[in-house]
A protein has these predicted regions:
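Flexible nucleotide-interacting loop at or near the entrance of a catalytic core
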Residues: 1-3, 13, 97-99, 217-287
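ABC ATP-binding cassette signature C-motif
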Residues: 1-223, 278-287
Length: 289
């Protein structure tokens, strides 16, 4: 079944402290898919959400959004006006003409999240402010809903209610969460940010371990094959380079480049998995030219 494309990012690069968080990243959001956005801390998950929402720009790349598409966002930081009522905060992005239509939803969602909508926002605890931010994002019913750690400060009953709500949501969802069970229960797609690249799985988070192990096993085999080829090149260089210095110095330099690239990729692979122990490569500095 095909799903309408709502948003697309192409060849994206974002730089932080003079280093790329990711580069050449492609991302598509389609109608009706509920995506678990995962990756190690610092991989750029929240950055991607801010880019999608439009509060952060790409350093390089292009972004396209289907005209008329609405995007809602629960971020890590919740901003509100002093002495603003919870009710008014939730309705902040909804026009006056639509408020009457959405009022019943405010009551249902606020009650499910244990919010008193008659209180002022500055009277709420940090956890209550997070729940108010979540309520606002849900009430807006955007075409693309972005949730960054929505289960923080929710009890089990509220989490169960949120799972049911999101599974019936008609728009598209992109969610970051450390709650693995929650992601398993709500998602039908995975975006995995891995070493600056975005890997996509068309199944939900419950299949992540199986899917990621398959990808990493394949990568391990490719690294082993490259290591074998490099070993053959090193053996050739050790035996023949002294007799053919001028004719083969370029090839020896290529071997060193292969060595450096493989070491870099092995280090990156170990950092990602810490599962596979790859033996160190023979040091080409022992070959004298």
């Amino acid at each position: 079944m095909s799903h309408q494309l709502l948003l697309s990012i192409r060849d994206a690069m974002v730089i932080y402290k003079e280093k790329p968080v990711f580069e050449n990243l492609d991302l598509n959001i389609h109608q009706g898919l509920r995506t678990a956005l995962i990756g190690k801390n610092g991989a750029g998950k929240s950055t991607i959400m801010k880019i999608i929402y439009g509060i952060k720009s790409l350093d390089e790349g292009e972004q396209w959004v289907e005209p008329g598409i609405s995007i809602g966002y629960l971020g890590q930081e919740i901003n509100y006006q002093e002495n603003q009522k919870v009710f008014d905060f939730i309705f902040e992005n909804i026009s006056g003409d639509e408020r009457e239509l959405f009022k019943y939803k405010v009551d249902i969602i606020a009650d499910s999240l244990q919010l008193n909508i008659s209180l002022n926002m500055n009277m709420l605890s940090g956890g209550q402010i997070r729940r108010a931010g979540l309520a606002r994002a849900l009430v807006e019913e955007p075409d693309i809903l972005l949730l960054d750690e929505p289960t923080n400060h929710l009890d089990l009953n509220a989490i169960s209610w949120l799972e049911n709500y999101l599974n019936g949501y008609r728009g598209s969802l992109v969610c970051i969460s450390h709650d693995k069970r929650f992601l398993e229960n709500i998602s039908n797609q995975i975006f995995w940010i891995d070493r600056g690249n975005l890997r996509v799985c068309s199944k939900g988070f419950k299949f992540f371990d199986e899917w990621s192990s398959m990808l990493l096993d394949q990568e391990a085999r490719e690294l082993a094959k490259r290591k074998q080829i490099l070993a053959q090149e090193v053996e050739w260089a050790s035996r023949g380079v002294k007799a053919r210095v001028k004719r083969n110095i370029r090839r020896l330099n290529q071997v060193k480049e292969m060595r450096d690239k493989l070491k870099k990729d092995e280090s990156s692979f170990r950092h990602t998995t810490k599962k596979i122990n790859i033996e160190p490569i023979k040091d080409l500095s022992l070959i004298h030219i």
